[in-house]
Amino acid sequence: MRCRSLPAGLISLAVMALLPAADLGLSRAQARPTTPIPGATAQGLPARIPVPSRQEGRRIVINGREQTARWQWLPSVGGNPSQLWLPLEVLQGQLGVASSPRVDGSLDLEWFGRKQLVPSSEQRSLDDEVAVEASPLLQAAGVRLQAEGDRLLLEMPLPGLLRVRASPPGADRQVVLDLDGAALVRQESGQILLGLLSTASQRSELQALGVAVSASREGLLLRPRGGGRVLTLGGPDRVVFAIPPGSGAGGTTASSPAAPPLDPRLQALLNRTVQLDRQVLPVGSRRMLISSVRFDPQQSPLDLRLLTRPDGMQGLTSLTALAQQEQALVAINGGFFNRVRRLPLGALKAEGRWLSGPILNRGAVGWQPGGLPSFGRLALQEQLIDERGQSWPLSSLNSGYVQRGLARYTADWGSGYQALSGNESGVLIRGGVVLQRLNGAQLQRGIPLGNEDTLVVGRSGVIPPWSETSRLTLSSQSSDPVGQQAYVMGGGPLLLQAGRVVLNGTAEGFSSAFQGQGAPRTVIGSDGRQIWLLTLQGVDHAGPTLGETAAVLRQLGLREALNLDGGSSTGLFVGNTQTVRGRGVAASIHNGLGLVPRSGRAQGDRAGG
């Protein structure tokens, strides 16, 4: 709930060598308006009678493809919106807008060289999604905007593909597509949809570079090996993506490929040790679509695993990428995260190692391989003790939840740390000894983190008190036995314990608006014998409330259950395909849960069975 394109600063030298010198004949204006031009009309649309009141809805149609997403339109003279508020996920995932957060909480948006700065004061919530006022950026790129009742229509003309270029073969080989205008860029399940017009010869050029290609009425569908990372540039408009070494000739078809077949390893387990189910159940006067996967961890050759990116806690990816990375046969999205900063907001523990600590005493699930999970509300109580025996409490571990106090970061955060707030200070610790004191300027530039390093950061006037060479001892204790398990995932609110509804979102720091809204849901639970992975979606409505979710889970026979991230993040991956998309699209997420074959145990029966 809570981009896909790389920030321009990360473009490789190989790409820079490909970029043309400034050409006034090709360059397009890189507009950076802060308000719409007075009296202007959306391109190609007739002027409309101004409507003084706000319009809003829950459906967005982008070049004919519809999804569920909240929007708000504040119209002005001529039909151009004085403000158009859209979820950040829609801009990133469905259009290809790149975003980069600043320390002060503001957000830099960039799309084909068109830029927009969004201060933190101009970011708001639409239901459970972070939203920004996007009309300047969209209009600068020529997107046509129109509201029709509950639907918002975004129409983007398909530009032409002018030229295909590539850097020499190597570890960082890049492909550059020169366009005659900005294009829709959508990444999903390892594929890239580019809303552009291409010729057969251009598709053959891409095929020769090792990129599988297909054409459709929506544009060009690319399937670069490794999934591809996409960058958009302006002046002139370009799309850049990487292809891995050794890519041979790719295939090309006239239309989009069919969905991949069910993984034969999963097929062999169905109705034996793994059960899949999809049903519609009534909850009061409303109906819910429930998709579930359940298995007995003591009898199945599958293990429940945490799914995270291999490069640390900073960044988002797709559920499909997380599942395929660990060869998971089934996967669901996991815990909460900050979509603006792309950082975790809850407990993550794997193989006994804390990757990110819990926050706000929220609900969590913990388990040992081959066993049923336990559920509870969890806090991590950590402190540093100096040589005099004085203790100093730590507020968080490897977390995107920024608050006053001392926060701890390790190499599990990533290869380095860069300040998340203003006026930070810190100390770098190695082997229990303070090596270096760090000021705010150093932290804003970034500090590398080695495997043996611990960085303690002070925020909001709290300054780490230790001098260099001071010796410190870490004390760490979980508030609940859940935290002592080898694997832990945080979510919330906790829904069921011992068959009773224990829902208390206020105690876990959730807002009243969050607690009362209906939305797609993702849940992990247990009936005392099997582990359940579930998604719940509304039939002709936004989705179940948390109370309705708890009720329907009891109806299904679950005794323990934890709500995970939901809304657009809700997703279920089954045997090569993401079968559930919370609001109609496969949104980027931070982490997940997967069912992964044990070594040598993926062919149906346990040894001797």
PLM feature spans:
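Gly/Ser/Thr/Pro-rich low-complexity, intrinsically disordered segments
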Residues: 9, 13, 17-70, 74-83, ...
